[in-house]
Amino acid sequence: MNICVFCGARPNFMKVAPVIRQIENLRREGKPVESQIVYAGIANDPTLEDSLFSDLGIRRPDVFLGVDCVNLNELTGQVMSKFEVCLQDHPTDVVVVVD
């Protein structure tokens, strides 16, 4: 099973960290589970310090969509468009959206 965990903002990582850790535990136990962490923002987002991920016990996102805009309509459109491409590139069985 391939699980995609989508986070749109920094606080979402705190909410979903227990889920990500459990997915990793299952994988280490030999269960057929893979995961991908997708972040809507940019890779060099200053709010995503390495310490955040080490404190939460999870890895940094695997994919950064690079959405960086202020207008809500533009933001929504860019996230939908770029996430669709991401899912086409990385087939997924389950999507967990954290908001």
Question: What residue ranges belong to the model's regions?
Answer:
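Active-site and donor-binding regions of nucleotide-sugar-utilizing enzymes
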Residues: 4-7, 12-22, 28, 52, ...
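Conserved nucleotide-sugar phosphate-binding/catalytic loop shared by glycosyltransferases and other
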Residues: 31-75
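Nucleotide donor/acceptor-binding cores
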Residues: 1
